Every structure is written in C-alpha cells, then in structure tokens.
Amino acid sequence: MRFTIISKNDEKSKKTRSYITKELEKRGMKEDKIKPEIIISIGGDGTLLGAFHMYQHLLSETMFVGVHTGNLGFYADFHPEESDLLIDLIDRKEFVKTEFPLVHVKVHTDNGEENHLALNETTLKMVQGSTLAIDVGIGGKHFEKFRGDGICISTPSGSTAYNKSLGGALIHPSFQSIQLTEIASINNRVFRTIGSSIILPSHHTLNVYPNKNDTHLLTIDHLHFQLNGISSIEYKVAEETIKFARFRHFPFWHRVRESFISS
C-alpha cells in the first residue's frame, strides 16, 4: 500500500511521523507523496484539513486517517502511543471506508467562475467588517434578504466547528446535507431573516447574490479569499466525498460527548 504522512511541525508530531514511516516501510509499504492510497494526518483537525485540501484532486483514489498529538479530534482515531496498533491495522488492511459529505462552492465573478470544496465550512463576510447585504435563494427561488455580519455554510462533520459556536445544529455525517447558519443577522421592522439554521438536502441548492461593487471575504475551511465583483455564489452537497479509513468503531455522538460535555 502506498502512503504519505502530513504532520504538524512540533517535535511530538515529527517524532511520530518518523516512527510510523520507518515501520510501514519495514513492512514493504512505499511512501508516495504523489499518488498515495492512504494519507496519515498527524497533528490536529487543522492538519487534516490541510491534508484534505492538498490532496482533494485524489478524493476518489485515496482515504485519510488521523493521529491526534493533542486531545482527541473529530477527524482522528488514534493517539501517538497507539502508533504500533495503527501500523498493524494498516498492514493487515483491517479497515472500512467511511464517506463524509462535502460542500461544493461555485463562485461567479467578473473574472469567471471558481469552484471550491470545503470539509468543515465556508463563510461569506465583508472585508472591512461592515454589514453584509445579500439576497438568498433556495432551489432557484428567492427566500430572503439577509443583512448582518455574514453567513456560514457547513457540512455535517463541520457542524461541530464554527457552526456550533453560532448556535447551529449538530448533524450526523451520514446525512447528505449542508447547513446555512446566520452570523449576527440584523432583524427589525425593516430587515427580517428566518433567524434559524436551515438544513438543505443534497437535491437542493443555496444561492446568494451579493452587491457586485463590494469586496467580500470568502473562507473555505482555513483558506481565505478576498474577491471583487461577485455576482452569485452557489452552495450544494458536493458529488465528491472524503473517505476515512476506520480501523475501529468510534461513533460520532461519542466524539461529540467527549469533546463538549464529558468531564
């Protein structure tokens, strides 16, 4: 099996990377940074997000597994002290593939069209922190006029991240959906929004129409893009998915409990 390892630059992560690389190569596996069959992320969820964006062109051919060098993350199943167990399981190919949905973002600007994939979430705000003014459409029909700090569109697995801090719902990754959550919306007699998170199934699209004369800040996970002349943005459940190699059962709701309410 061809593998590659993406790790943080701290000593613990680098040491873990060196050990896993050496042991996998001892067992006849080849490190291949160009076309890996499995990508091992060592660090935190941010490290895995970076690995995802680095290899998103290979989503149909590869899978991910996380080793967390801090506290357990949502995308990590192993700690560094479990490296030998992970190595054995990879060697024996004792895993199942679990697929998580992604959000596809299509941006139309004066300069053409941009397409992005997000694993956690994508947001739209104003660059200078002023009020974002957009028309919102669902399924090709006008839904509302939004005024506020911004909007957040998250995946089910990303619903536990920024979306949760905004008061959005937590969604199990088995649901093929995206979630729209408002960021500090303005609601009064003049401006009125739905005020609740909206969960859209895979056959629905979300469209927003900003003011083309404004400069907007578009985020795709940890990536930031400053864009001018945006005429519209389309959000939907992506056709692509991210595949995780699951070597043991670790339910989503157990991860939620351990991260947020377990003492």
What are these regions (language model features)?
Residues 1-36, 72-152, 160-263:
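Catalytic phosphate-donor-binding core of small-molecule kinases
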Residues 44-47, 70, 157-159:
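Short glycine-rich anion-binding loops that position phosphate/pyrophosphate groups of nucleotides
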Residues 47, 51-66, 76-79:
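Glycine-rich phosphate/dinucleotide-binding loop and adjoining beta-alpha-beta core of small-molecule
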Residues 41-42, 64, 153:
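Conserved SAM-binding loop
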Residues 33-53:
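Short, well-ordered secondary-structure micro-motifs within conserved domains or adaptor modules
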